[in-house]
């Protein structure tokens, strides 16, 4: 009886092992080129937030692609509309508390997801919102340009 129980246990362990998903190699560390590009995107995004809070529309205009789009809660803007909203104080970015960032590359396009808490003045009212912000950067003429910026408000703080 003991021998048959032991054999059954060994058989079950063998079946379980053969049904388990095959182990894959660990994800290789990013190459220095992609790590460098990732850091460049992170730095550029952080600089963009500073320019937005300083209302530095000249620097933002150089960063924003001509065909860029900006998606806010309740509004979608073109490059010129976004710059005007910032210039006029329609939205004043007071502070950005970055909680988490991740960069992904699809071909030569960089997608940055940033979880943050934003304090802004919108229409004269100060608001604080938790967001995930999606930024899409594309290489143009040897530099990165911002093609899209989208705010998604989180339900949890």
Label each residue range with its predicted role.
Residues 1, 14-15, 28-31:
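Intrinsic disorder/low-complexity segments
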Residues 1-7:
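Bacterial N-terminal signal peptides that target proteins for export
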Residues 7-16:
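Bacterial N-terminal signal peptides
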